[in-house]
Amino acid sequence: MSDNVMTRERPDVGSYEDIAAAASRTTGMTDFGDGVHEEGLRVLVEDLASPEAGLTPRGNYFQRSEVKSALVGVLLTQAQFAAHPEHRDVPIERPIFLMGLPRTGTTILHRLLHADRQSQGLEMWLTQYPQPRPPRDTWEADPIFAAMQQAFTAHHIESPEFMGIHYMDATTVEECWRLLRQTGKSNSYESLANLPRYTDWLKNQDWTDAYARHKQNLQLVGMNDVDKRWVLKNPSHMTALDALMTVYPDALIVYTHREPVTCIASSCSLSAETTEGHSDTYVGGVIGHTQLDLWSRGFHAFHDARAKYDQDQFIDIAFGDLVKDQIGVTRRVYDQFGLDWTPEVEAAVTDIDREAKEGKAAPKHSYDLKDYGLTEKQVLDAFDR
């Protein structure tokens, strides 16, 4: 990620071939693996060039960078897979997946669960450049880590409003959708532009191959921490619960709840802040209606699929409960899944709880559903079961 993404311009996004060639030039690599990513990214690039996307010169640069980042991720992981063939033998046992509508508390709960020294998550820089996780005391000397940290510092200065919505830096444990992008399948693209054809394509996909590669990435990143339990989060896991459970049959699912009117308004605000100045069409009501479609679709897909599985592998967390008692809710998760709640775990969780309520990561965010052409009734009807 670069602060230049915020200012540079292009007359167009370019073709898939052009972007793939640019990714190869950046990395010096040409092995894109089995090519499973290609169909989705071709549909995506064509949609980005359409009048419906309505990209501005800034938007062209930003969106091209997003596609290129996915392809760079493919190239880098292919090289790492080849360099470390033993990654395929790394077990992934009872991983915890947090999911739910955006803005339901998954970020803070993710960080609370990750506080346990027996847990591991995907740090931001390793979601973009997967490799066996180096020792923590070596990160600052890594040129990739240093460049990403510098970029986040610049982004924080340029866009403090965004960081108030969702604070990030290179060290924070983050969502794992960047791994899914390596197969061309990600709901994240739908939150960055108006993409009707890509959305229709994605609705009809089997995500099993995406989660198979997701697992392979976790095996790679966790090679040096094989005894640690994975704690992962991504709201859009709701969309593909069957595929996730096929690849991770012993997964432990933490599902977060909040009334959808607030969730959708907040999600729209995040999309609007992220894409400001990038499109003449992805604004206001278009953001509202595409976000409502995306998240109501995921909500219903999750609830339709959930009943097939052992309910002991699931726990429901209400946002209100999390706000009132973050430590107590974290312990409920441990109790539900039979995990050891020790004094050391409680102390670590307490530290994260304190940090979350003060300092640079404190939430500062306001939003209004009406700004996105939606009414409360429309939202409630879309989520009615």
Regions found by a protein language model. Give the residues of each.
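PAPS-dependent sulfotransferases, especially Golgi type II membrane carbohydrate sulfotransferases
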Residues: 1-79, 195-211, 218-225, 267-316, ...
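Glycine-rich phosphate-binding P-loop
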Residues: 98-116
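Post-Walker A helix-loop "phosphate-sensing" segment adjacent to the P-loop in P-loop NTPases
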Residues: 115-125
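PAPS-dependent sulfation machinery
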Residues: 128-230
